UniProtKB/Swiss-Prot annotation:
One of its GO terms (molecular function) is ribose-5-phosphate isomerase activity. It catalyses: aldehydo-D-ribose 5-phosphate = D-ribulose 5-phosphate. One of its GO terms (biological process) is D-ribose metabolic process. This is Ribose-5-phosphate isomerase A.
Length: 230
């Protein structure tokens, strides 16, 4: 049986085939992207492509620059042709939960800018509903994070915890905290997103709703491609 890494590696050929010379691409954050970046760099070198990359995190930018990729700031581009990223959960409508790597705000900015957004996952990320297996990340200001957490818990049957990294609070590239919201039962994603995004102190939620154009899934039986219904 193939492990998660092997399943992700299976999908990368389908991703690379969508990269064309002259593109500006959005590059996500996380374990899947760490596998993909060296292959993008190799593609650029082998085919002598001119590719501009816009990264969703400082970590991704560092990895890409180490491989001599041309990386620019998001404010230096007018458009993004193709965004590529992983996801923590994917439902049947290709809605996502993202933010396990803590880069959800920048990921959403870049993914929404892109003409086409392609997601790469292994089959364990496919769920019946968002929040079924993975806590929803919410990026919040440090100033009132506790009040935001308690407001969420008072309103919904949700357990909220502030994310920590080696016993200290996790800090995003934007200087904020992440609240991980574990749903105790099914809550409609659009409803919960609207509630959360209007709380003072919330920058963004990890719900990526109606954004993905395609999800490439590595399964034990092979690669499965899911396309957004139009």
């Amino acid at each position: 049986m193939k492990d998660a890494k092997e399943l992700k590696l299976m999908t990368l050929e389908d991703v690379l085939s969508q990269i064309e010379n002259g593109m500006t691409i959005g590059i996500g954050t996380g374990s899947t992207i760490e596998l993909l970046i060296p292959q993008i760099a190799e593609l650029i070198q082998q085919k002598n492509y001119t590719i501009t990359g816009v990264c969703t995190s400082n970590k991704t930018a560092f990895l890409a620059k180490e491989l001599a990729m041309n990386i620019v700031d998001v404010n230096d581009v007018e458009k993004i042709d193709l965004a590529i990223d992983g996801a923590d959960e994917v439902d049947s409508a290709l809605n996502l939960i993202k933010g396990g790597g803590g880069a959800l705000f920048r990921e959403k900015v870049i993914d929404e800018m892109a003409d086409r957004f392609v997601v790469v996952v292994d089959e364990s990320k496919l769920v019946n509903y968002l929040g079924e297996t993975f806590a929803l990340p919410v990026e919040v200001d440090k100033f009132n994070w506790y009040q935001v957490a308690k407001k969420i818990e008072r309103t919904y049957d949700i357990h909220v915890s502030r994310r920590v990294n080696e016993d200290v609070p996790f800090i995003t590239d934007n200087g904020n905290y992440i609240l991980d919201c574990s749903l105790q039962n099914r809550i409609p994603a659009y409803e919960l997103h609207e509630f959360l995004i209007h709380l003072t102190g919330v920058l963004e939620t990890g719900y990526f709703l109606d954004i993905a154009d395609q999800v490439i899934v590595g399964t034990q039986e092979g690669v499965k491609i899911l396309n957004k219904e139009t």
